[in-house]
């Protein structure tokens, strides 16, 4: 019950800066359009048990780096826990789109 209340509270009281959210949405589009670059990077490590996990890790890492960097650049501070929670929700919103990408 309390999780439901907190989750709904977080949905209606967005604190993530709109500029940061815009940058992240663009970075998601950019990452999904640069599959060839990421695939080349993944393949440069030779035989991997699961290249998709590594490729998705690269994308998530790029997005996390952008989130953190833009928070520091635009807001002049580290992101708050609530902003980080909104970042996670943004990733979940694009989860299917990101998981459809294959790097093998």
Kindly give the residue locations of the regions a language model identified.
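Amphipathic alpha-helical interaction modules
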Residues: 32-70
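Short, Lys/Arg-enriched N-terminal segments with co-localized hydrophobic residues
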Residues: 1-15
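Long, C-terminal folded domains that constitute the functional core of proteins
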Residues: 21-23, 39, 50, 97, ...
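Non-transmembrane, amphipathic alpha-helical segments
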Residues: 16, 23, 48-55, 83
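Amphipathic alpha-helical segments in structured regions that serve as interaction surfaces
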Residues: 20-32, 59-71, 87-95
């Amino acid at each position: 019950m309390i999780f439901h209340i907190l989750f709904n509270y977080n949905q209606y009281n967005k604190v993530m800066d709109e500029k940061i959210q815009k940058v992240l949405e663009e970075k998601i589009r950019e990452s999904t359009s640069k599959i060839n670059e990421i695939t080349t990077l993944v393949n440069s490590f030779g035989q991997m048990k699961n290249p998709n996990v590594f490729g998705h890790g690269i994308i998530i890492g790029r997005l996390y780096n952008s989130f953190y960097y833009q928070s520091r650049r635009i807001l002049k501070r580290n992101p708050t826990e609530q902003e980080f929670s909104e970042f996670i929700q943004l990733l979940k919103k694009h989860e299917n789109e990101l998981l459809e990408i294959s790097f093998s």
